[in-house]
Design a protein with these regions (language model features):
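Leucine-biased recognition of intrinsically disordered, low-complexity hydrophobic segments
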Residues: 7, 16-19, 34, 48
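Intrinsically disordered, low-complexity cationic segments
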Residues: 9-12, 40
Length: 418
């Protein structure tokens, strides 16, 4: 997360929350110089010690290690006044998020590594709160549920990612319910967890994850959007979707509804693969070919990230731009082979299937008590009632429209076969 004054000059993120349902504490980020350490306080206000700059990888990498060269950056863009995007990268063995005033080189811990991008919606203040709340809650839940878990296996890991995402959705939804001026707030979430040599992903909305191998960028998430539904139904082409005025309409988000559909997938990684997570402020303007070219020509993820942000801004920068880039290295990974496949691969496990009518097991009754009052400066621009109402109605109409379009399409297919 951007815990300092960012290079683009935008204002520092205001006070945030991190919910620990067992032992709640408040995570407050203050405007500090890049070299300073952010302050964490417990529920009594006591100062907590934080390792802001984890020890980098030793010069000598032990055999079998997986090494990550990672950088993340968020830019406000050319037209927005506020940045509603958020991100986090964290070693789940330690639980501390990494700072990114420089390129980080880290050994992957045995508990995995978290990469996440969130793109808020609902107006400047609401979107900013939703995205920051999402990354804080997901990280906090992974600290609680995963760091001390007795079973370290893919099913348990994916189940933890899913549960953390559900808690984030419930938290944002309940918080908006307690603050009428923020109703309709929501955020996308693209969450990737590296465990061993495999990425496990939880997807909500239309932020994206790409894997770049041998100079080719392949999307390994699937947009939960109107355009994606119409593409799958054969109504429009990918090229038509990219030009559509409705390409930014999403069908799933954290916060607007009490329950959310989470797309769970997985992808094995090889040595020299590059993971790119980004908000649609990047993917909507920069084509996969350009992403692949940038990370291939710029082996340093920091330089690649700067190049991609510059490309998006050169195209007008109409939205916030966030990118997380991780290059995978080390003897713990195999070299790529021709038989390896890259793509949207569903993680299918009976142990993760739960009835859609059953809410996640959460202590939501105590959520309001565990959220610290937010500072007044966070509400410099709150969404107007007209903006919130328009966005809410659009969401309902879009969902209904998708059902109608798909029904008519399949009916037409049946009639043409008679």
């Amino acid at each position: 997360m951007c815990n300092e004054t960012c290079p683009d000059g935008r204002r520092v993120r205001p006070a945030l929350i991190a919910l620990g349902f067992a032992e709640p504490y408040i995570f407050v980020t203050f405007p500090v110089p890049l070299a300073a350490t952010p302050v964490r306080r417990d529920a009594t206000g006591a100062r907590l010690t934080v390792n802001h700059h984890p020890t980098p990888t030793d010069p000598i990498t032990p055999p079998g290690a997986i090494v990550l060269h990672v950088f993340a950056h968020s830019d406000v863009g050319r037209t927005r006044e506020h940045n509603e995007d958020a991100f986090v990268v964290a070693d789940l063995s330690r639980g501390d998020p990494l700072s990114f005033d420089h390129l980080r080189t880290e050994r992957a811990g045995n508990r995995g590594t978290l990469f996440m991008v969130a793109d808020g919606m609902g107006g400047a203040a609401a979107g900013e709160i939703a995205s920051e709340m999402a990354v804080e809650v997901v990280l906090q839940q992974l600290r609680r549920r995963w760091r001390d878990a007795k079973t370290v296996d893919p099913v348990a890991f994916v189940g933890t990612l899913k549960a953390a995402t559900e808690v984030a959705n419930a938290t944002i939804h309940h918080y908006a319910g307690d603050h009428p001026e923020l109703r309709g707030m929501g955020t996308t979430a693209t969450i990737a967890g590296l465990l061993g040599d495999t990425l496990y992903l939880a997807q909500v909305g239309d932020s994206r994850a790409y894997l770049v191998r041998d100079g080719i960028a392949i999307q390994i998430t699937k947009d939960q959007s109107l355009m994606q539904k119409l593409i799958e139904a054969g109504e429009i082409t990918v090229e038509e979707a990219e030009m559509s005025d409705r390409r930014n309409i999403i069908l799933q988000a954290l916060g607007p509804e009490p329950h959310v559909k989470i797309d769970l997938t997985h992808q094995r990684v090889r040595r020299d693969d590059v993971l790119v997570l980004c908000s649609d402020g990047l993917s909507g303007l920069v084509k996969p070919e350009q992403i692949a070219q940038a990370v291939t020509e710029e082996a340093n993820p920091e330089l690649a990230a700067e190049r991609l942000v510059d490309l998006a801004n050169a195209s007008g920068g109409p939205d916030n731009i966030t990118v997380v880039i991780a290059r995978f290295d080390g003897t713990g990974l195999e070299s790529a082979a021709p038989v390896d496949e890259i793509g949207h691969r569903v993680f299918d496990s009976p142990e993760l299937v739960t009835p859609t009518s059953t809410p996640p097991v959460l202590r939501v009754e105590s959520i309001a008590e565990q959220i610290a009052p937010l500072p007044p400066e966070l509400f410099e621009r709150t969404p107007t009632p007209v903006e919130r109402q328009r966005r809410g109605k659009l969401y309902v109409r879009v969902v209904a429209a998708v059902g109608i379009v798909l029904t008519l399409f399949f009916l037409w297919q049946v009639l043409t076969k008679l």
